[in-house]
């Protein structure tokens, strides 16, 4: 499946535009970069959730390579992760378990809301996208980017979401490590 096949099969929202003025270049910063809060980003990539479902976010301070990334639910009543910590938002929403606990597990899957393309520019050449417009593109480290494709309608069939992700990986549009 090619990027064109994916775009045809799964219509996408236009580029997500985050309304903010570019910031001035300063100590440690880059000029022309749009600033967005964690809360605004989560709201943009999860414009609608199945009833009773929540987005999952993982957050930790310190070295992100040490230890796990436990997920917690995100909703307006909870505090968003700090911009000072390492944060990760998954592409799917999940239902709480029967005991009320929240875990990002297949058994609690609600819907897939976007595709995340990781390691663009390093493991996956940016020209591999061949002019495809992403919903967002974030430089996560020098020369390494994460891109996203917000789906027009969330996929509520987990098997379909897995097949789509596998097709994106098989097409060479994302690092194979994104499947786990």
Residue ranges of predicted features:
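DNA replication initiation on ssDNA origins
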Residues: 1-114
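Short aromatic/hydrophobic-glycine micro-motifs
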Residues: 12, 51, 134, 173-174
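Structural beta-sheet core signal
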Residues: 56, 147-149
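Structured loops at beta-to-helix junctions and adjacent beta-edge loops in soluble globular domains
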Residues: 60, 92, 118-120, 140, ...
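Surface-exposed flexible segments
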Residues: 66-72, 126-136
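DNA replication initiation modules
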Residues: 99-132, 151-180
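Short, conserved phosphate-binding/catalytic loop or strand-edge motifs used
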Residues: 138-146
